[in-house]
Amino acid sequence: TKTIPNATLGAFCEENHVALMHTSRGVLDGLTFATKDVFHIAGSRTGFGNPDWIRTHSAEKTTAPVVKSLLDAGADMLGRTLTDELAYSLSGENFHYGTPINSAAPDRIPGGSSNGSAAAVSGQVVDFALGTDCGGSVRLPAIYCGIMGIRPTHNRITTDGVIPFAPSFDVIGWFASDATIFEEVGSVLLDQPAMSLDVKRLIIAKDTFPLVDSSVNEVLKPIIKSLVDKFELTKEINVSQDRLAHWFEIFRTIQGSEIWANRKQWIKEFHPVFGPGIRERLEWASTIDSQTISWAHSEYVEINNYLTNLLEPDEILCLPTSPRVAPLRGTETNTLEILYRTQAMNLLCIAGLGGLPQISLPRVTQGGLPLGLSFIGAPGSEMNLLALAVNLVYQPSF
């Protein structure tokens, strides 16, 4: 099909638009999805959010296995969705292609880098959408757009046929606004049946809440209280020993060094044009020296080991997804960088450093703006987290 779905939303790619019909029947029969423009589709060029990228790359020979799995399960792909440039942003404002409309808060940004996928689900154009998450590129747009998002365990779902970003942290994720669909997509991509919820203990990450804006905390506190009442066994822990800012520094150093290692050849050869924010981040990434990288790696090994062993399979860690509601469209780049990106990544880096699965579930502020509450599980506990989503979203107290 040549038609771009709901073009006024600005969520879909036009230059390399492609739609695919289901290849078989299965649990996703009759459902529609969209795919972030980092997944390869045979016979089509992947755009990666930058016109110079698409211009300097040829059509792909194979389709990413995750896309094939969804088509095999009966879902139809309606199109590719916009991404931030080289996926190196959490804002969702693309200098070249514009900003998709956030249907949950139209005067605010959708978040990124899986901006088009989140906007397509929030705008009810598709039932679910594929994204990728490294530093928060599914979890943050999910809450800005008032929908559900998941980052699975690192290496749990193949990233073959997906443009690499920072492989130490890259995962495939997805969005949905319906909890049952959210879970069904998980069953297909994780190749595991749905399970009944198994939570013995809810753990509150108490060091994360002081980072959160008062208007967000005001909504989250009563929800936390109702969760504490629901799960009899709860405890509070200082998950980072008050070192979240340090953890973020480790995360961004490794992430930046891997992005630069992956992209420097192409940048030096083609001198692509980058928009504000992306350009500065890439310039900074190019300056990270080998000594800093090895320091970050040795710290990372220690943090990763601690986080991997932090939770039992039947324990869930609860924390805010982001410190603030989505900023207004057109917010100045420096404000975005300091108040939104850096502060959000202090929270988002926890699951990344641990390679842990995390879901974000939507709530709203007193003024009706979307925000989110997150749950992190032990490695491989995605189906339990998805069961939690199903269990909670249909409860009046949540």
What is each PLM-predicted segment?
Residues 1-126:
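Gly/Ser-rich catalytic/binding loops embedded in alpha/beta enzyme cores
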Residues 31-51, 253-299, 362-369:
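Short helix-loop capping/hinge segments that flank enzyme active sites or metal/cofactor-binding pockets
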